[in-house]
Structure formats: C-alpha cells, structure tokens
Amino acid sequence: MRGPVHLQIEHQPVLDAALRAELIGIWVDATNAGGALGLVAPTNRQAAEALAAPTWTRVEAGHDDLVLGRRDGRVVGWCVLESRGNPLSPHWRSLKRLQVHPDVQGQGLGRALLAGAEDVARRLGLTAVHLTVRGGTGTESFYTGLGYREVGRLPGALRLADGDDRDEIHMWRDLGAG
C-alpha cells in the first residue's frame, strides 16, 4: 500500500513569466504524453500559450482561480477553477485543465491536486464543481472513483481530427458530499 502523498497546494500564486513558462511546459508535456487537455498531440508551446492567454488574463483579473501543486519545490501539476460569470451560478465553478507532469504520474499526485482544488473551492464558498472530460480516454472513471457523477454528454462535440469525433462528458461533484 502506498503511503501518504505530499503535495503543497498553492492558490492564486503570482503568475509571472517564469511560472507561466513552467505551466505551459507541463501542459505541452502532458498533452504529448496522451493527456486530454484541450489540445491534440503532437502540440507545442505556441499552441498552448495561445490557448492559455485568456485563462491567464482571467486569473490575473481575479475572475478565475489558479491552483497548483508543488512537490519538493517543483511545480508538478495545476488546474483552474473557472467562474461562470453568471449571477445565477456563483455557488459552483468549472474545474479546467487538471494535469500532472507525465514524469510524476501514477504517484497519486492527480488525486492530491484534485483534493487540493476542491479544498480551495470550499474555502471560496462553492458548493459544487463541474468538469468535462474527453470521451474515449477512460478519464471519467478516475473522476467517478473520486465522487464525480456524469450529468450529461455532448455526442461528437470534440473533433480531434477528420473522422475522430469524441463525446464531451460533463461531470459534477457536490462538495458537501465529502
């Protein structure tokens, strides 16, 4: 049996150029290792930076919350709690881009990062978290095992390539459920 996973969770760290570069590096490496994170492998820094730019702007403006995990001082994973910007849904956010660097995957760090993000969400007064996963990856079983439930599916909503359309699976977790 594996011992406890030690991951230092940081909420809203200063998003300077060095940290941005680190986060983009993790994103590119995780995508190229098979991660379903909004890009299609093979990808590069330029593609990730273009997709990340609006996120960085929203984090810096205080609309969204960056959560990252450090192990022995090194950033090994990150995610964003994205605000809906809707006055009818201030009680929940969407969890976006949960990722752990491929060279430390399989050590429980993804679970630890998710638990840390959920703790941040609770401290923000949120009562639920929503996320989406790409169909055909098996990722939904990871989240189901951690208390998330499928609440909807958009058939063929994600086009990875001609002839390769995947479902976008929506999942939900009531944060009061433990």
Where is each model-derived feature located?
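Actinobacteria-biased recognition of intrinsically disordered, low-complexity terminal regions
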Residues: 1-5
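Conserved catalytic-core motifs of GNAT/GCN5-like acyltransferases
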Residues: 130-134, 144, 149-167
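Active-site acidic-Proline motif in GNAT/NAT acetyltransferases
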Residues: 101-103, 107, 135
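Acetyl-CoA-dependent GNAT
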Residues: 7-97, 101, 114-116, 120, ...
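Helix-turn-helix
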Residues: 139
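Conserved GNAT acetyl-CoA-binding A-motif
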Residues: 114, 121-134
